[in-house]
């Protein structure tokens, strides 16, 4: 297997080159123009963040990517799937309101915002794969139906996986609620009776 190229840029800016410009150059250098973008539905898989925290990519980066994709004739949209846990992202109405609170809306993002697995997390496609642990993951319909999926991901520490990034964004983040249930099914509570009162 050939080693993947990893592109890097620093955070230095100048009056003629800001961070958005640098991101666009990185995306172009990585070969975005070689994708069959014309008339394609392009899902930009992103995490909209929980209201009140800052652990998400800012909407202006998503807007820059959406505009670049549109310049190649694509039909981009931002997407994420509902969460398994109760909270502000467990259904599409609250999820979209949370996204708007963090600045993700069709005006700021320069493209539509679609919750991938629908109103209650039940809109999905089963994708047959030959996986060891999963044979037919349940992927949010908007992601499964897209012609192209681009992961726009921040890197973070994760309590179970050690770290989260593109693989978690696509793997867990693309799963519809029933798919998330299956992914977490191997995690059973363990009771240590000797520690019980």
Predicted region positions:
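N-terminal and secondary-structure boundary signal
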Residues: 1-197
């Amino acid at each position: 297997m050939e080693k993947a190229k990893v592109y890097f840029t620093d955070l230095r800016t100048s009056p003629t080159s800001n961070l958005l410009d640098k991101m666009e150059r990185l995306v172009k250098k990585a070969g975005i123009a070689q994708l069959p973008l014309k008339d394609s539905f392009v899902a930009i898989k992103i995490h909209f963040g929980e209201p009140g925290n800052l652990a998400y990519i800012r909407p202006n980066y998503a807007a820059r990517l959406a505009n670049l994709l549109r310049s190649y004739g694509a039909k981009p949209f931002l997407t994420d799937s509902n969460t398994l846990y109760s909270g502000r992202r467990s259904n599409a109405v609250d999820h979209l309101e949370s996204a708007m609170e963090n600045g993700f809306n069709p005006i700021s993002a320069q493209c539509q915002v679609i919750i991938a697995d629908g109103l209650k997390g039940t809109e999905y496609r089963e994708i047959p794969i030959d996986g060891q642990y999963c044979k037919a993951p349940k992927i949010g319909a908007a992601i499964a139906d897209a012609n192209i999926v681009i992961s726009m991901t921040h890197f973070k520490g994760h309590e179970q996986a050690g770290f989260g990034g593109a693989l978690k964004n696509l793997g867990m983040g693309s799963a519809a609620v029933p798919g998330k249930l299956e992914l977490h099914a191997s995690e059973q509570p363990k009771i240590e009776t000797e520690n019980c009162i």
